[in-house]
């Protein structure tokens, strides 16, 4: 494996050997209750709580994040979004399974993680489970614009889901340092990627609002095409894809990071002598 101090991959400088990946899209093969928008970037379950399995249109590149944002929730169901990878070509399936867990996984060559409101973090080897459950601290976004997972470096800014600023929202969070949504909340952002290892296998990682949950599956066949799996299950009704840029952070993004360090709460941005467009960008509107 690459030296941890030498983070490479899609988050590193672009080169002919590692070009920017194409925009992510959902596959035209999906569960019976899924309605896909014309662009292939939004998937909505139109009835029931099942038959909501979706796939990426193309296999993922190593270190490429398939990132979704929860757009709609539906009350009355128990359970949440499920996320993972499969080495099965969606086009080769005789029928899309009703559930990703256990149906798709039981077909083999598929690894799926059920997202819960708590306890999504996977303990590292030798790490107590209680210690793994403690979040690493969302303020890292303000000092480190990249998320580092094994040998890959991924721009963190678009990985983080945030609630829309409200009239009293500044009383409920300490600006963006603590304004990280619960994993299953509306506007929360969740992603999946794989990281190859020297032995020819790969680790699957789940990202929730800019934080790596650790290797939720090991021993994946890195040499085989791996498609993302998104199960729009139960209380999760609709998701949309979020596109990432893997180069250097834009000047606009760096400006936002600096501004966030110097204001007390979100409403304070309104009194700054800045163009309205930049204010809206800083407030994630």
From Swiss-Prot:
GO CC list: muscle tendon junction; VCB complex
Boundaries of every NHR domain copy: 23-244
Domain of life according to the entry: Eukaryota
Keywords tagged on the record: Cytoplasm, Ubl conjugation pathway
Signal peptide limits: none
A Pfam family: SOCS_box
Record region (Disordered): 1-28
Gene3D superfamilies: 2.60.120.920, SOCS box
Keyword Cytoplasm belongs to the record: yes
Pathway: Protein modification; protein ubiquitination
Tissue specificity comment: Expressed specifically in skeletal and cardiac muscles.
InterPro entries: B30.2/SPRY_sf, Neuralized, NHR_dom, SOCS_box, SOCS_box-like_dom_sf
Subunit: Probable component the ECS(NEURL2) E3 ubiquitin-protein ligase complex consisting of ELOB/Elongin B, ELOC/Elongin C, CUL5, RBX1 and NEURL2. Interacts with CTNNB1.
Function noted in UniProt: Plays an important role in the process of myofiber differentiation and maturation. Probable substrate-recognition component of a SCF-like ECS (Elongin BC-CUL2/5-SOCS-box protein) E3 ubiquitin-protein ligase complex, which mediates the ubiquitination of proteins. Probably contributes to catalysis through recognition and positioning of the substrate and the ubiquitin-conjugating enzyme. During myogenesis, controls the ubiquitination and degradation of the specific pool of CTNNB1/beta-catenin located at the sarcolemma.
Protein name: Neuralized-like protein 2
Species classification: Eukaryota, Metazoa, Chordata, Craniata, Vertebrata
